[in-house]
Amino acid sequence: MYSAAGLMNGQQLLSFEKGVPLEQYIIVDYYLYIKALHLIFVITYFAGLFYIPRLMVYLVEAADRPQAESDIIIPQLQLMMRRLWQIITVPSAVLGLIFGLWMLWINPFLLGKSWMLIKLVFVGLLVLYHIKTYRFYKAFLQGNGQRSARFFRIWNEGATLILFAVIFLATLKDSIHWIFGLLGLFSLAFLLLLGIRLYKRYCN
């Protein structure tokens, strides 16, 4: 069990303390439920965000198939993309954001932590990534996808890099040095691009 005082100071207490009102423990219990819901919807959001660009790759490749095949495949892929975006990705993004803001409202102490401020910067980048992905999504539904399959394979890894950064920041907090963090992200980006290149070479 955690106390509210311990939560606000970034500490975890293993038992009830004298003089701490029961209401504060109840608040912390709610905080843990809110945190769990936040994590659940972040996971489902990224699941959608990972698969949307993959469907875009398939749509680009389907356009190069014979007309009889593309006329069947493309509408089905567009339907899958629309359902994934409207039923899973967007609702998960909204709920994940609501529960995340709720956590900060309960525990504003987090805003004084440097790791949280850096994490919020990556969340801002994620919002920009989401907006751009939405524009690609609308273009594909209108039959105007003008990028290559390789571009969307690379674009697909943008969410991966942001996810790695957010998870490491939330887990290691202030114990991670920003230089090592940047080196880790650049190394991951290099490995992802190398994997895409090797995959393309293998397919050819």
Descriptions of predicted regions:
Residues 9, 19-204:
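Polytopic transmembrane helical bundles with strong interfacial aromatic enrichment
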